[in-house]
């Protein structure tokens, strides 16, 4: 049915894009706030370890004019990778389980976040129509970027890839994040999910990493829409907390974690340059694609509503000024 939510029989994992954004925000905060030779050297080493170059070069082919990262609106593709060593997969062979494109409008000081369903039925250049998640398995980050650019007809300026081990650490390094818990059903479901390890109370509280993780991952208490709102609440809390450099008491462990678990074409210079703008954002809006379940020959896909896709394309193009 049109507009029906994408459903799977297997247990869904945590919305991993929250972790990716958390890691990126922490990187930007620490990059901008580092002082002293030791701090700079440590962060610079982590940045070099995390840095990857795209085969296309620094600028997207979708950019007609030369891209000025200090002045132009820009986009960041956030990828959450499920690389399982037990299957002998390398990171490039793994599928992308979380796929979020974020556009940043310089003039308006706003951001828009678009989650791309992993099972979306899209054209993967050189491979034909398949699940979006397979683009990464076929050609790593380069092919994933090409697929997004063709699908949305916009430039992907930066890409950040994570294997999701740092969420709890990031929240804990921020000394927790403030969240308002409203639902008794959510409280009871979290208690059940964690077998009593996490017990929340109604009201506004500062959640540690384990509590925040439980809050964003529980899925049986309410709808997908309300779960998405909880995830956006935590993400917004992370961004707000990250604006205060004093909220990070020690960065050694988190910098090490980022170096090992993030891959990006952002340099340390890029990160420091972007920090003031990102932390001055007036709003972060979440936009959504729609579609329906599609199962030719018994294989599940999520077929996108083409009218909605065209609307999203235009919205993102306007946001980037392309």
Curated annotation (Swiss-Prot):
GO process annotations (BP): cell wall organization
Residues annotated as transmembrane: 20-40
Membrane topology: Single-pass type II membrane protein
Extracellular side stretches: 41-322
EC number: 2.7.8.-
Cytoplasmic side of membrane: 1-19
One Gene Ontology molecular-function label: transferase activity
One of the Pfam families matching this protein, by short name: LytR_cpsA_psr
Entry GO terms, CC: plasma membrane
Subcellular compartments: Cell membrane
Principal cellular location given in the protein's record: membrane
Class of enzymatic activity (EC top level): transferase
Pathway it works in: Cell wall biogenesis
Keyword list, A-Z: Cell membrane, Cell wall biogenesis/degradation, Membrane, Signal-anchor, Transferase, Transmembrane, Transmembrane helix
Keyword set includes Membrane: yes
Protein family according to the UniProt entry: Belongs to the LytR/CpsA/Psr (LCP) family.
Function: May catalyze the final step in cell wall teichoic acid biosynthesis, the transfer of the anionic cell wall polymers (APs) from their lipid-linked precursor to the cell wall peptidoglycan (PG).
Assembly and binders: Interacts with MreB.
Protein's recorded name: Polyisoprenyl-teichoic acid--peptidoglycan teichoic acid transferase TagT
Gene symbol of the encoding locus: tagT
């Amino acid at each position: 049915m049109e507009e029906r939510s994408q459903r799977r029989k297997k247990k869904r994992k945590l919305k991993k894009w929250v972790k990716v954004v958390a890691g990126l925000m922490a990187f930007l905060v620490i990059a901008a706030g580092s002082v002293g030779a030791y701090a700079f050297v440590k962060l610079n080493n982590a940045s070099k370890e995390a840095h990857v170059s795209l085969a296309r070069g620094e600028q997207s082919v979708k950019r007609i004019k030369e891209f000025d990262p200090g002045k132009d609106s820009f986009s960041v593709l956030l990828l959450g990778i499920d690389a399982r060593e037990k299957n002998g997969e390398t990171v490039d062979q793994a599928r992308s389980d979380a796929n979020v494109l974020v556009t940043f409008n310089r003039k308006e000081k706003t951001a828009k976040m678009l989650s791309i369903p992993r099972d979306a039925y899209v054209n993967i250049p050189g491979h034909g129509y398949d699940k979006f998640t397979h683009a990464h398995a076929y050609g790593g980050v380069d092919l994933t970027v090409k697929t997004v650019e063709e699908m949305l007809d916009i430039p992907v300026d930066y890409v950040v890839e994570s294997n999701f081990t740092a969420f709890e650490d990031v929240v804990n390094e921020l000394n927790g994040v403030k969240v308002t818990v409203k639902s008794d059903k959510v409280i009871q479901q979290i208690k059940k999910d964690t077998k009593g390890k996490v017990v929340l109370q109604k009201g506004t509280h500062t959640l540690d990493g384990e509590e925040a993780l439980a809050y964003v991952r529980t899925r049986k208490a309410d709808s997908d829409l309300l779960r998405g709102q909880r995830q956006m609440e935590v993400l917004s809390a992370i961004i707000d907390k990250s604006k205060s450099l004093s909220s990070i008491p020690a960065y050694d462990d988190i910098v090490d974690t980022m170096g090992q678990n993030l891959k990006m074409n952002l340099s340390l210079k890029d990160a420091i340059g972007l920090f003031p703008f990102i932390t001055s954002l007036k709003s972060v809006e979440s936009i959504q694609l729609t579609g329906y379940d599609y199962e030719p020959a018994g294989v599940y896909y999520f077929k996108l509503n083409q009218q909605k896709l065209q609307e999203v394309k235009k919205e993102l193009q306007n946001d980037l000024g392309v």
